Curated annotation (Swiss-Prot):
May act as an autosomal functional substitute. Residues 43-197 are annotated as: A. It comes from Symphalangus syndactylus. Keywords: Cytoplasm, Cytoskeleton, Hydrolase, Membrane, Nucleus, Protein phosphatase, Transmembrane, Transmembrane helix. Composed of two structurally equivalent A and B domains that adopt a dual specificity protein phosphatase (DSP) fold. The gene is CDC14C. Dual-specificity phosphatase. Preferentially dephosphorylates proteins modified by proline-directed kinases. This is Dual specificity protein phosphatase CDC14C.
Amino acid sequence: MKRKSEGRSSWAAATCSPCCSLTSPSVKKIRSPTQQDPRHRDPQDDVYLDITDRLRLAILYSRPKSASNVHYFSIDNELEYENFSEDFGPLNLAMVYRYCCKINKKLKSITMLRKKIVHFTGSDQRKQANAAFLVGCYMVIYLGRTPEEAYRTLIFGDTSYIPFRDAAYGSCNFYITLLDCFHAVKKAMQYGFLNFNSFNLDEYEHYEKAENGDLNWIIPDRFIAFCGPHSRARLESGYHQHSPETYIQYFKNRNVTTIIRLNKKMYDAKCFTDAGFDHHDLFFADGSSPTDAIVKGFLDICENAEGAIAVHCKAGLGRTGTLIACYIMKHYRMTAAETIAWVRICRPGLVIGPQQQFLVMKQTSLWLEGDYFCQKLKGQENGQHRAAFPKLHSGVDDISINGVENQDQQEPEPYSDDDEINGGTQGDRLRALKSRRQSKTNAILLTCPLAVLTSALCSVVIWWIVCDYILPILLFCLDGFGT
């Protein structure tokens, strides 16, 4: 352990230990001169964590000085999470992709071949968590580390990170950890959800914007989550409202065959059905969890859909994420925490409040249903699968869990459109916030080049005034003095 005054220079001159020995990752903590107890780290200590022999993650409490053999960089103000409330991460899929490309480019750069690459973050614990998330994803995706190996590298010693929370207003009693996120990424790669070789960054960043449709793929070629359309396109109450026609051509191009609406009717379903889509309504209240009947209905529709399924509620966050998560848990046996982590990486804000605990509660039963589903399909030819679905679904209803059979439950009262007041629900607030936030970001991006252009024009005008008016007068005066 070295003091701050000697830490950086000595590290820069030293050779980093390779991280192929993953069971004992290396860490350097730079202690303050006043700290004497080696068992506890001062919160203001700088920390360096070895990722590979050339790559490190650093938590620094003062900006590092450049060196000839060390390249420092930070993404704290470059890849920023756009929060809804007190949520702060994890960063979305496009940011993970951008980060991985950045690291690969730096490691392969001819000008940096002899340099150590240090990704540093500052004192903000939320930024630290997102920096660790990005580095961990890079280890899992490009270095072939297991989630546990990546996580162990990041928490070596007493280094810790705050967990991620949901987008709900108020207190939070459910969190997802970095390890949950790494497991989600690993399983997404395993099941083909995540493949950066075919990832379309431009498409992701275009369509996730509120003004361009506010949609994200959760499972490529299978599930889209998007905000609820309205009867006509307009800008109202601070957010963009899109009509069904906005989505029809894109859905057709991407082989979407089924639309599932989870909120009250804001548009005529005929807009989609007349265009050749199947359209289904499964209403339940904004911010609530679905009944077993709704979960079963959703799974039945998805398992019988010929193509991709586009799901929406009002904001395309809470209800939408919850039911898509149920499908993922049933058919891919991911845990509730892993599933929540994955859907939020794809579309930040998904699954809100009590819907998180609902998924934890449903995990075991959904796994059992998935096992039963697979057993029924096993041994059957592909051509027989479709005919087997109705029988399978009726069989799933009779599964017994912990010795208690699934019996018919009393249906809830029909959902009323009056349960959602225009402009007053959680979904309204979330989508309005997202739309205003992105509009502000776009305005900033537009303002920067305009400011540069304005400054350049002002310089030209000033130079023109000097050359055409002031300079001749000065020359005339000087000539007069000379004579």
